[in-house]
Protein backbone atom coordinates (compact mmCIF):
# COMPACT_ATOMS: atom_id res chain seq x y z
CA UNK A 1 0.00 0.00 0.00
CA UNK A 2 2.86 2.37 0.71
CA UNK A 3 4.01 2.20 -2.91
CA UNK A 4 0.49 2.85 -4.19
CA UNK A 5 0.15 5.92 -2.01
CA UNK A 6 3.08 7.57 -3.82
CA UNK A 7 1.07 7.98 -7.03
CA UNK A 8 -2.52 8.23 -5.76
CA UNK A 9 -3.97 11.72 -6.07
CA UNK A 10 -1.27 12.88 -8.48
CA UNK A 11 -0.59 13.07 -12.22
CA UNK A 12 1.82 10.37 -13.42
CA UNK A 13 3.15 8.77 -16.60
CA UNK A 14 1.97 5.15 -16.73
CA UNK A 15 2.70 2.41 -19.25
CA UNK A 16 -0.17 0.73 -21.10
CA UNK A 17 0.35 -3.03 -20.68
CA UNK A 18 -2.90 -4.46 -22.05
CA UNK A 19 -6.59 -4.16 -22.88
CA UNK A 20 -9.23 -6.24 -21.11
CA UNK A 21 -12.67 -5.71 -22.63
CA UNK A 22 -13.25 -1.95 -22.43
CA UNK A 23 -10.63 -1.46 -19.72
CA UNK A 24 -6.98 -0.63 -20.29
CA UNK A 25 -4.44 -2.12 -17.90
CA UNK A 26 -1.68 0.24 -16.82
CA UNK A 27 1.52 -0.19 -14.85
CA UNK A 28 2.78 2.44 -12.41
CA UNK A 29 6.42 3.51 -11.82
CA UNK A 30 6.65 1.20 -8.79
CA UNK A 31 4.81 -1.68 -10.43
CA UNK A 32 1.32 -0.58 -9.35
CA UNK A 33 -1.61 -2.09 -11.24
CA UNK A 34 -3.97 0.63 -12.45
CA UNK A 35 -7.14 0.41 -14.57
CA UNK A 36 -8.44 2.90 -17.13
CA UNK A 37 -12.03 2.85 -18.33
CA UNK A 38 -12.38 3.95 -21.94
CA UNK A 39 -14.91 6.58 -20.84
CA UNK A 40 -12.04 8.31 -19.02
CA UNK A 41 -9.88 8.71 -22.14
CA UNK A 42 -9.34 11.85 -24.19
CA UNK A 43 -11.46 11.72 -27.33
CA UNK A 44 -8.47 12.33 -29.60
CA UNK A 45 -6.17 9.81 -27.89
CA UNK A 46 -5.52 6.26 -29.08
CA UNK A 47 -3.52 4.30 -26.53
CA UNK A 48 -0.90 1.83 -27.68
CA UNK A 49 0.41 -1.06 -25.61
CA UNK A 50 3.97 -0.41 -24.50
CA UNK A 51 3.65 3.38 -24.61
CA UNK A 52 3.49 5.75 -21.63
CA UNK A 53 0.82 8.44 -21.18
CA UNK A 54 -0.06 11.02 -18.57
CA UNK A 55 -2.91 10.13 -16.19
CA UNK A 56 -4.41 11.26 -12.91
CA UNK A 57 -4.52 8.37 -10.43
CA UNK A 58 -7.37 7.94 -7.96
CA UNK A 59 -8.82 5.11 -5.84
CA UNK A 60 -12.37 3.84 -6.07
CA UNK A 61 -14.30 3.34 -2.84
CA UNK A 62 -12.63 -0.05 -2.33
CA UNK A 63 -9.14 1.41 -2.67
CA UNK A 64 -8.54 -0.08 -6.13
CA UNK A 65 -6.51 2.23 -8.38
CA UNK A 66 -8.00 3.83 -11.48
CA UNK A 67 -6.72 6.39 -13.97
CA UNK A 68 -8.30 9.20 -15.96
CA UNK A 69 -7.10 11.54 -18.67
CA UNK A 70 -9.66 14.13 -17.54
CA UNK A 71 -7.35 16.04 -15.23
CA UNK A 72 -9.01 17.50 -12.11
CA UNK A 73 -8.29 21.01 -10.85
CA UNK A 74 -7.35 19.57 -7.46
CA UNK A 75 -4.60 17.05 -6.69
CA UNK A 76 -2.78 16.10 -3.51
CA UNK A 77 -0.25 18.80 -4.41
CA UNK A 78 -2.69 21.51 -5.51
CA UNK A 79 -5.45 23.49 -3.76
CA UNK A 80 -8.52 24.92 -5.45
CA UNK A 81 -12.21 25.56 -4.81
CA UNK A 82 -14.46 22.49 -5.21
CA UNK A 83 -18.24 22.56 -5.45
CA UNK A 84 -20.23 21.00 -2.61
CA UNK A 85 -22.68 18.39 -3.94
CA UNK A 86 -24.37 17.48 -0.66
CA UNK A 87 -23.80 17.12 3.06
CA UNK A 88 -24.68 14.24 5.37
CA UNK A 89 -23.65 12.98 8.80
CA UNK A 90 -20.24 11.99 7.41
CA UNK A 91 -19.41 15.48 6.16
CA UNK A 92 -19.50 17.39 2.86
CA UNK A 93 -19.24 15.60 -0.48
CA UNK A 94 -17.51 17.63 -3.16
CA UNK A 95 -16.92 17.51 -6.91
CA UNK A 96 -13.23 17.67 -7.81
CA UNK A 97 -13.72 16.72 -11.47
CA UNK A 98 -13.44 12.94 -11.03
CA UNK A 99 -15.96 10.15 -11.78
CA UNK A 100 -16.55 9.88 -8.02
CA UNK A 101 -17.32 12.44 -5.33
CA UNK A 102 -14.83 13.14 -2.54
CA UNK A 103 -15.68 13.45 1.15
CA UNK A 104 -14.54 16.26 3.44
CA UNK A 105 -14.99 14.52 6.84
CA UNK A 106 -17.30 16.04 9.44
CA UNK A 107 -14.39 16.33 11.87
CA UNK A 108 -12.85 18.98 9.58
CA UNK A 109 -16.03 21.06 9.30
CA UNK A 110 -17.17 23.77 11.76
CA UNK A 111 -18.42 22.55 15.13
CA UNK A 112 -21.55 24.68 14.64
CA UNK A 113 -23.55 22.75 12.06
CA UNK A 114 -25.39 25.83 10.77
CA UNK A 115 -22.00 26.97 9.44
CA UNK A 116 -21.52 23.80 7.40
CA UNK A 117 -21.50 24.36 3.64
CA UNK A 118 -24.63 23.75 1.59
CA UNK A 119 -24.96 22.31 -1.93
CA UNK A 120 -23.58 24.85 -4.39
CA UNK A 121 -21.05 26.32 -1.96
CA UNK A 122 -17.33 25.91 -2.72
CA UNK A 123 -14.61 24.66 -0.37
CA UNK A 124 -10.90 25.43 -0.73
CA UNK A 125 -9.35 21.95 -0.59
CA UNK A 126 -6.61 19.59 -1.64
CA UNK A 127 -6.67 15.78 -1.74
CA UNK A 128 -5.55 13.60 1.16
CA UNK A 129 -4.84 9.87 0.80
CA UNK A 130 -4.83 7.62 3.87
CA UNK A 131 -2.91 4.37 4.40
CA UNK A 132 -5.74 2.32 2.95
CA UNK A 133 -5.75 4.36 -0.28
CA UNK A 134 -8.99 6.12 0.64
CA UNK A 135 -9.17 9.64 -0.77
CA UNK A 136 -10.55 12.62 1.15
CA UNK A 137 -10.76 16.37 0.76
CA UNK A 138 -8.59 18.41 3.10
CA UNK A 139 -9.49 22.03 3.86
CA UNK A 140 -6.82 24.66 3.29
CA UNK A 141 -5.10 25.75 6.49
CA UNK A 142 -4.13 29.31 7.30
CA UNK A 143 -0.48 28.56 6.48
CA UNK A 144 -1.49 27.27 3.04
CA UNK A 145 -3.49 30.40 2.23
CA UNK A 146 -0.59 32.54 3.48
CA UNK A 147 1.51 31.10 0.64
CA UNK A 148 -1.08 31.42 -2.14
CA UNK A 149 -2.93 34.73 -1.69
CA UNK A 150 -2.42 37.88 -3.78
CA UNK A 151 -1.20 40.74 -1.53
CA UNK A 152 -2.58 44.27 -1.83
CA UNK A 153 -0.48 47.23 -0.66
CA UNK A 154 -2.62 50.19 -1.72
CA UNK A 155 -6.13 51.54 -1.12
CA UNK A 156 -7.44 51.04 -4.65
CA UNK A 157 -9.97 48.46 -3.44
CA UNK A 158 -11.21 50.48 -0.47
CA UNK A 159 -15.03 50.59 -0.36
CA UNK A 160 -15.20 48.21 -3.32
CA UNK A 161 -17.59 45.27 -2.88
CA UNK A 162 -16.13 41.98 -4.09
CA UNK A 163 -17.24 38.37 -4.03
CA UNK A 164 -15.34 35.96 -1.81
CA UNK A 165 -15.76 32.65 0.00
CA UNK A 166 -14.98 31.85 3.65
CA UNK A 167 -12.27 29.20 3.95
CA UNK A 168 -12.19 29.46 7.76
CA UNK A 169 -14.93 30.52 10.16
CA UNK A 170 -14.24 31.47 13.78
CA UNK A 171 -16.14 33.35 16.46
CA UNK A 172 -13.62 36.18 16.26
CA UNK A 173 -14.23 36.65 12.53
CA UNK A 174 -14.49 35.23 9.02
CA UNK A 175 -11.47 34.47 6.80
CA UNK A 176 -12.20 34.70 3.07
CA UNK A 177 -10.48 34.25 -0.28
CA UNK A 178 -11.66 35.85 -3.52
CA UNK A 179 -11.39 34.47 -7.07
CA UNK A 180 -8.56 36.97 -7.63
CA UNK A 181 -6.70 35.54 -4.66
CA UNK A 182 -7.32 38.39 -2.22
CA UNK A 183 -7.20 37.30 1.42
CA UNK A 184 -9.85 39.09 3.48
CA UNK A 185 -10.58 39.13 7.20
CA UNK A 186 -13.96 40.28 8.52
CA UNK A 187 -13.91 40.91 12.28
CA UNK A 188 -16.99 39.83 14.24
CA UNK A 189 -17.83 43.51 14.84
CA UNK A 190 -18.18 43.99 11.07
CA UNK A 191 -20.93 41.41 10.57
CA UNK A 192 -24.47 40.83 11.78
CA UNK A 193 -24.51 37.15 10.82
CA UNK A 194 -21.76 34.61 10.29
CA UNK A 195 -21.46 33.21 6.75
CA UNK A 196 -21.23 29.49 6.07
CA UNK A 197 -17.94 27.84 5.20
CA UNK A 198 -17.60 28.09 1.41
CA UNK A 199 -20.60 30.39 0.90
CA UNK A 200 -20.30 33.03 -1.85
CA UNK A 201 -20.71 36.41 -0.14
CA UNK A 202 -20.30 40.07 -1.01
CA UNK A 203 -17.80 41.86 1.21
CA UNK A 204 -16.90 45.56 1.32
CA UNK A 205 -13.18 46.30 1.60
CA UNK A 206 -12.30 48.74 4.40
CA UNK A 207 -8.49 48.56 4.48
CA UNK A 208 -5.35 46.42 4.38
CA UNK A 209 -2.43 45.50 6.63
CA UNK A 210 1.34 45.42 6.15
CA UNK A 211 1.24 41.85 4.81
CA UNK A 212 -1.15 42.80 2.03
CA UNK A 213 -4.16 41.14 3.63
CA UNK A 214 -7.45 42.98 3.24
CA UNK A 215 -9.90 43.89 5.98
CA UNK A 216 -13.56 43.71 5.07
CA UNK A 217 -17.05 44.36 6.35
CA UNK A 218 -20.47 42.83 5.82
CA UNK A 219 -22.08 46.03 7.14
CA UNK A 220 -23.22 48.93 4.93
CA UNK A 221 -21.58 52.32 5.03
CA UNK A 222 -22.98 54.48 7.81
CA UNK A 223 -24.98 56.69 5.43
CA UNK A 224 -26.50 53.59 3.79
CA UNK A 225 -27.78 52.02 6.99
CA UNK A 226 -31.51 51.77 7.33
CA UNK A 227 -33.58 53.39 10.05
CA UNK A 228 -36.12 51.30 11.96
CA UNK A 229 -39.02 51.94 9.55
CA UNK A 230 -36.86 51.27 6.50
CA UNK A 231 -35.64 48.02 8.04
CA UNK A 232 -39.22 46.87 8.68
CA UNK A 233 -40.16 47.48 5.04
CA UNK A 234 -36.95 45.89 3.76
CA UNK A 235 -37.41 42.76 5.91
CA UNK A 236 -41.00 42.33 4.69
CA UNK A 237 -39.89 42.73 1.07
CA UNK A 238 -37.34 39.96 1.54
CA UNK A 239 -39.93 37.75 3.25
CA UNK A 240 -42.37 38.20 0.35
CA UNK A 241 -39.91 37.55 -2.50
CA UNK A 242 -39.06 41.18 -3.16
CA UNK A 243 -42.52 42.63 -3.86
CA UNK A 244 -45.27 44.21 -1.74
CA UNK A 245 -48.63 45.63 -2.98
CA UNK A 246 -48.09 49.01 -1.29
CA UNK A 247 -46.94 52.44 -2.52
CA UNK A 248 -47.23 56.09 -1.56
CA UNK A 249 -50.96 56.16 -2.41
CA UNK A 250 -51.92 53.16 -0.26
CA UNK A 251 -54.47 53.83 2.49
CA UNK A 252 -53.24 54.79 5.98
CA UNK A 253 -55.30 51.93 7.47
CA UNK A 254 -53.68 49.27 5.29
CA UNK A 255 -50.20 50.67 5.97
CA UNK A 256 -50.83 50.70 9.72
CA UNK A 257 -52.14 47.13 9.69
CA UNK A 258 -49.19 45.66 7.78
CA UNK A 259 -46.23 47.85 8.76
CA UNK A 260 -47.43 49.25 12.12
CA UNK A 261 -46.46 52.79 11.11
CA UNK A 262 -48.23 55.94 9.96
CA UNK A 263 -48.60 56.76 6.28
CA UNK A 264 -46.22 59.70 6.73
CA UNK A 265 -43.55 57.44 8.24
CA UNK A 266 -44.11 54.89 5.46
CA UNK A 267 -43.70 57.50 2.71
CA UNK A 268 -40.50 58.86 4.28
CA UNK A 269 -39.10 55.33 4.62
CA UNK A 270 -39.82 54.23 1.05
CA UNK A 271 -38.50 57.58 -0.21
CA UNK A 272 -35.24 56.92 1.62
CA UNK A 273 -35.07 53.34 0.27
CA UNK A 274 -35.74 54.63 -3.24
CA UNK A 275 -32.97 57.25 -3.03
CA UNK A 276 -30.56 54.51 -1.95
CA UNK A 277 -31.68 52.46 -5.00
CA UNK A 278 -32.76 49.64 -2.69
CA UNK A 279 -36.34 49.62 -4.01
CA UNK A 280 -38.35 50.66 -7.04
CA UNK A 281 -41.71 52.39 -6.52
CA UNK A 282 -44.24 51.38 -9.15
CA UNK A 283 -47.98 51.83 -9.55
CA UNK A 284 -49.53 49.85 -6.74
CA UNK A 285 -46.36 48.17 -5.49
CA UNK A 286 -42.77 48.44 -4.28
CA UNK A 287 -40.06 45.99 -5.37
CA UNK A 288 -36.50 45.21 -4.34
CA UNK A 289 -33.78 46.20 -6.79
CA UNK A 290 -30.65 44.20 -7.55
CA UNK A 291 -28.82 46.41 -5.05
CA UNK A 292 -31.54 45.65 -2.51
CA UNK A 293 -31.10 41.92 -2.93
CA UNK A 294 -27.32 42.32 -2.65
CA UNK A 295 -27.81 43.56 0.92
CA UNK A 296 -28.99 40.03 1.74
CA UNK A 297 -26.06 38.48 -0.13
CA UNK A 298 -23.71 40.64 1.93
CA UNK A 299 -25.25 39.47 5.22
CA UNK A 300 -26.28 43.03 6.02
From Swiss-Prot:
The keyword tRNA processing does not apply. Keywords: Virulence. The keyword Translocase does not apply. InterPro entries: CvfB_fam, CvfB_S1_2nd, CvfB_S1_3rd, CvfB_S1_st, CvfB_WH, NA-bd_OB-fold, WH-like_DNA-bd_sf. Pfam families: CvfB_1st, CvfB_2nd, CvfB_WH, S1_2. Belongs to the CvfB family. Contributes to the expression of virulence factors and to pathogenicity. Involved in the production of hemolysin, DNase, protease and protein A. This is Conserved virulence factor B.
Amino acid sequence: MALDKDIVGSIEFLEVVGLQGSTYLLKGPNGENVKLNQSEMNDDDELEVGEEYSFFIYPNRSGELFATQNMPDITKDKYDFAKVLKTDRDGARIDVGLPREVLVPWEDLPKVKSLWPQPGDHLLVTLRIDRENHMYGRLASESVVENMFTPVHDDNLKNEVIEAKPYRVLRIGSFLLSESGYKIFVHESERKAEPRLGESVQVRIIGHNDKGELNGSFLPLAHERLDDDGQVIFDLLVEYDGELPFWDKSSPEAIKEVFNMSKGSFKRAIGHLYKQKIINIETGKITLTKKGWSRMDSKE
